[in-house]
């Protein structure tokens, strides 16, 4: 297996920037966001060869945990996709998951971020307790002055940093006014002891004197006691409060009551997310809101400060995910790589690069480049892939750039119709032997989903013991034979690919199936075998027999 193409170009770009602008950039100021551990393993192997092994490397989830400050219990990034695939197969797609898809789309949108911004604005207005800062009955600063500092004077900082600045301000004010307070206490002491004598006079004198002495010693405690009246929460508690109290009430003000579909999505999003939070469970789409709230309230660690970020498989991230990366990293310097034709996470990802650029980067210079020439796979294989992706509806196809293969090698595609699963396994084994005999090192048997792959693995392990099932938790792979679901194969390349069963039951003419089959086909660099039982999928070209 190899990870080449766009990723390799990005890594060489990092090396170029570091060596060409060594005074401006340090390796540790670069970050790569990769889709999975496979990519990270490949990257960590290739970066030392480029001399830039200090570059930070994360999956989006791991970076989110770094920002939030704790690891969250989150399902595998592909779990929702698996659910979609399975429900499409059993025919209950519309009934079971339509609302789930729409929830993901809305949660990944800039609109959802805008509601969180409005919520944080409301929190900001109530953050400072409505009371003056006093020492006993002596007013140091009134509420309006302190609130003005928080809302306006220090508004470029996160909430926690603002409080730190206000603490400095209160300290300065306290010191300025402490002499007046001490003078008042001395006057009060004089009046208090004026008509007293003996022991009683001495006790009252000592009490006032101790209070005067404590002012200078205890001013830090006095300030801390005041600031501790601020009821702070962590980002999860704020997110929960947003969903429980703010979101539903305020969205009704902005949505026409006739827009029942959006109201239904919002209510489902709210109830489903709160139910998950109650069980300390989170979805991938919750990470951007949590990161954003954490950044606005608490801020982030210095080690998250990055000057340039590379985002691979970018088509699978939504607008909110990109926006939060831009905001947190405080940088518009990005290399964004993606292929909409491989956008299997369509329920949250990018469908139109132009719109994406207009939304996310409308205020900066953007260089948009398409890579059309492909040197990895053959013309025969790429022609089939292009014909498959051509099944997409017109409005989706217009944003897809078809690959133009350079290598013109004949007999790189083999296809066969089989009568049953037993015959299928036998044929797969025969093709593996043939490929290994011809010196090919990496061979992938690609099934549509994990269920199909588990069954293939179970059956083929009866006749050979060198086949490994990839389930998404793996962090590395060194050649050999693997069984891999189509959605996990994305971004990877193999010498030979065997598509286990491209029949009409597995792959229908819908956006997801078209993209999954396209991904599977384009993983092959030298040889592509397509098998199917009964009738072949209608999205395969006619010349596949």
Feature-to-residue mapping (PLM):
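The conserved Walker
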Residues: 2-3
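Conserved helicase motor core of SF1/SF2 NTP-dependent helicases
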Residues: 28, 37, 44-45, 49-53, ...
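Alpha-helical nucleic-acid-binding subdomain
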Residues: 18-310, 316-324, 332, 366
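Rossmann-like NAD(P)(H) cofactor-binding subdomain of soluble oxidoreductases
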Residues: 6
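Hydrophobic positions on the alpha1 helix immediately C-terminal to the Walker A/P-loop
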Residues: 9, 13
